């Protein structure tokens, strides 16, 4: 059951990434068709923009991410309990020892960052270290180390980059339509009025309008799948599903973080640091903790 869940989560992630690339290609084709008389040209431009966005975000410095979240680096002397747990989990996962940070915040939370295991880091809040016992801390750090081993940060970064590229292209197309660019393009087209042309025009407009929302939903779906995968992978490392269940139960009862956390960083944490409600739940980067616990109980 454990390995079935891991395989299923990986498969779903790759399907969602494929959907992402198709969305980007669709928007690029639509923009090219409407404004430069070449859908294929627009598609190529969109893929290049997405590639540049992804590269620029993947190589963002770990120091920048940690600084944005108010984290300070610790070592074996200053935080021996946390350091040794991370060391043990990294050893079991067969990855290099990540750098270790602490965030001074009473909320219970943790996250990992780094585009690959060679430049990765993990951070935990002081509140988490004060409340979690050894088994629960191992489960949480196993979750974060699993994100590193599974290259989740890189995958999530690619998803954010593609969503940003889609939103940028759609916004650019909207501004051009506002200033009459599409109207001039269509009026100059000697095939204007052809039935197929009208259908293509409508489809292109719908793609430009709806793609940003679709991209956001796909991005969130990828983030949720990687959380499920990290939970299951943590159990694979610790061989202790109850430790992960107990840790998630405590995380669920934790208050929101006291410091502001930007949207990009929110997706990194093991528990959504904002804890919004109502309509905001549709745009959570994390699956409900109750659902995560239920999946662990089925192992």
UniProtKB/Swiss-Prot annotation:
Keywords: Cell membrane, Hydrolase, Membrane, Metal-binding, Metalloprotease, Protease, Transmembrane, Transmembrane helix, Zinc. Its cofactor is Zn(2+). The active site is at residue 144. Binds 1 zinc ion per subunit. It is a multi-pass membrane protein. Pfam families: Peptidase_M48. The chain crosses the membrane at residues 15-35, 39-59, 158-178, 198-218. Zn(2+) binds at residues 143, 147, 227. Its EC number is 3.4.24.-. The keyword Hydrolase applies. GO terms for molecular function: metalloendopeptidase activity; zinc ion binding. One of its GO terms (cellular component) is plasma membrane. It is an enzyme of class 3 (hydrolase). Its main location: membrane. GO terms for biological process: proteolysis. It is found in: Cell membrane. NCBIfam families: PRK04897.1 (NF003425). HAMAP family: Pept_M48_protease_HtpX (MF_00188). Belongs to the peptidase M48B family. This is Protease HtpX homolog. It comes from Streptococcus pneumoniae (strain P1031). The lineage of its organism: Bacteria, Bacillati, Bacillota, Bacilli, Lactobacillales.
């Amino acid at each position: 059951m454990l390995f079935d869940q891991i395989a299923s989560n990986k498969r779903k992630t790759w399907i969602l990434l494929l959907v992402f690339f198709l969305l980007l290609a669709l928007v690029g084709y639509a923009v090219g068709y409407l404004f430069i008389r070449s859908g294929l040209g627009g598609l190529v431009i969109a893929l290049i923009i997405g590639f540049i966005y992804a590269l620029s975000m993947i190589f963002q410095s770990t120091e920048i991410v940690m600084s944005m979240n108010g984290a300070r680096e610790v070592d074996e002397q200053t935080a021996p309990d946390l350091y040794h747990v991370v060391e043990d989990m990294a050893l079991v996962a067969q990855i290099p020892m990540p750098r270790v940070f602490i965030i001074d915040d009473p909320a219970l939370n943790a996250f990992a960052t780094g585009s690959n295991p060679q430049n990765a880091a993990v951070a935990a809040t002081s509140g988490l270290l004060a409340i979690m016992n050894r088994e629960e801390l191992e489960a949480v750090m196993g979750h974060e180390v699993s994100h590193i081993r599974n290259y989740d940060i890189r995958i999530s970064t690619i998803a954010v980059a593609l969503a940003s590229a889609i939103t940028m292209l759609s916004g650019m197309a909207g501004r051009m339509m506002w200033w009459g660019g599409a109207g001039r393009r269509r009026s100059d087209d000697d095939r204007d009025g052809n039935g197929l042309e009208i259908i293509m025009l409508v489809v292109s407009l719908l793609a430009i309008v709806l793609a940003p929302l679709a991209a956001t939903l796909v991005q969130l779906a990828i983030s949720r799948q990687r959380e499920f995968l990290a939970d299951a992978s943590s159990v694979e490392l610790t061989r202790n599903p109850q430790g992960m269940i107990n840790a998630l139960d405590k995380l669920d009862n934790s208050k929101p973080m006291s410091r502001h956390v930007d949207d990009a960083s929110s997706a990194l944490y093991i528990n959504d640091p904002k804890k919004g409600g109502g309509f905001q739940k549709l745009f959570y980067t994390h699956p409900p903790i109750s659902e995560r616990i239920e999946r662990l109980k089925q192992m």
